[in-house]
């Protein structure tokens, strides 16, 4: 599903026209940085098919809202926004072939000056090097795997493999899992945990955050009684629950997402009689997780870490304004990641605006370089900067539980 948004200075509200086209699977050929055309285009690549849809719809709403707030223009140039799906019905989740095709499409459209995405860290590994070759900036509202930007967290060639041009062209507005995993382990100890069993979904994001949790748990004196990758398509996890009971686990951490069966694990822990708290990361911070697991499996049992505060608890003037504007514009509560979609778009628009006011041509390279200079950005998430790796300096995390079918914050860690 692809949605096109054209904003104008007169029309502050969005106009959405569905369009469709075939994605090329051909190899991407490096090209010279194209000059901006009029209009200019911003695209996003997020999983719009499957259970992540509600979360990503909220993120897309945030992007659209940010564009509407600048009147749909940068200087005299109109902004066109296109919402691209990187998921397939067959997988019910992001699809490597579609993400590659989206990157290909963006590269070969000279009007595209910014690529907002991806939602999944594994998807980012595909598009990052392709976009980097042509200076097309990528700003993620959701990727948290540290290895995408920092050495020592993944393969020996990471993150350099994602920067074939030698330049940093990938940025993210969300804290990374070297922060999140440690917060989860600290909280496990805080609630009285002594023996932890660490599960992961065998994907980039899940393995990464589980690995950080495991390392930090050992560092703070928790006993890791088991580590296991799970089959995310399994109908149940009764055998693993039995294994965890035998190991005496009083805390279970799952590095994974709603889409990789976190809800089924939660249900089987409770139905299997395992008296352990269940901790999951931000890949489960969405209403779809609560709906899939059910209140019985979560309330009093589960905790969910998240990179920031829940939308209604945003503390800054800009954060409060985002929350009220979102509710007014869309008639409902934003999901947790809506503000990150909004902030990603705002930082792109701010960079473009600075270039325009300076009389500098809006080209891919100029936009990339200007975003890299982002410092003391005053946004809905607070005041933050991008570091030399493209990571945000914002490190705020929250730990949340579930009550009456809704997320409720237990603590905030700044």
Where does each model-flagged region fall?
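Extracytosolic ligand-binding ectodomains
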Residues: 15-18, 22-414
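Bacterial N-terminal signal peptides
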Residues: 5-18
């Amino acid at each position: 599903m692809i949605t096109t948004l054209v904003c104008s200075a007169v029309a502050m509200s969005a106009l959405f026209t569905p369009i469709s086209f075939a994605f090329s699977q051909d190899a991407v050929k490096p090209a010279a940085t194209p000059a901006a055309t009029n209009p200019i285009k911003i695209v996003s690549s997020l999983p719009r098919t499957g259970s992540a849809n509600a979360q990503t719809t909220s993120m897309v709403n945030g992007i659209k809202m940010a564009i509407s707030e600048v009147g749909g223009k940068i200087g005299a140039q109109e902004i066109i926004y296109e919402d691209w799906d990187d998921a397939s019905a067959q997988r019910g989740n992001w699809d490597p072939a579609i993400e590659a095709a989206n990157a290909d499409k963006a590269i070969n459209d000279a009007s595209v000056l910014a690529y907002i995405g991806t939602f999944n860290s594994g998807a980012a590994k595909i598009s990052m090097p392709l976009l980097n070759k042509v200076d097309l900036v990528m700003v993620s509202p959701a990727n948290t795997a540290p290895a995408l930007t920092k050495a020592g967290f993944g393969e020996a060639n990471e993150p350099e493999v994602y920067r074939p041009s030698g330049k940093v062209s990938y940025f993210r507005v969300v804290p990374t899992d070297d922060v999140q995993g440690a917060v989860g382990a600290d909280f496990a100890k805080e609630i009285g945990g002594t023996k932890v069993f660490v599960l992961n979904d065998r994907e980039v994001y899940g393995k990464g955050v589980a690995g950080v949790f495991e390392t930090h748990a050992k560092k703070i004196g928790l006993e890791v009684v088991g580590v296991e990758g799970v089959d995310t398509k399994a109908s149940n996890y009764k055998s693993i629950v039995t294994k965890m009971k035998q190991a005496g686990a009083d805390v279970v951490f799952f590095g994974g997402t709603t889409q990789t069966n976190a809800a089924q694990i939660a249900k089987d822990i409770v139905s299997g009689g395992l008296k352990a708290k269940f901790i999951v990361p931000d890949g489960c911070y969405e209403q779809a997780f609560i709906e899939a697991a059910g209140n019985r499996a979560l309330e009093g049992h589960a905790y969910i870490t998240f990179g920031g505060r829940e939308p209604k608890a945003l503390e800054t003037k800009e954060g409060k304004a985002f929350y009220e504007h979102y509710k007014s514009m869309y008639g409902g509560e934003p999901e947790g990641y809506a503000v990150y979609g909004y902030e990603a778009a705002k930082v792109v628009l701010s960079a473009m605006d600075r270039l325009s006011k300076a009389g500098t041509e809006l080209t891919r390279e100029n936009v990339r370089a200007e975003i890299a200079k982002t410092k003391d950005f005053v946004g809905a998430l607070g005041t933050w900067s991008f570091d030399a790796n493209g990571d945000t300096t914002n490190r705020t995390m929250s730990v949340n539980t579930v009550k009456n079918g809704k997320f409720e914050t237990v603590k905030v860690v700044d």
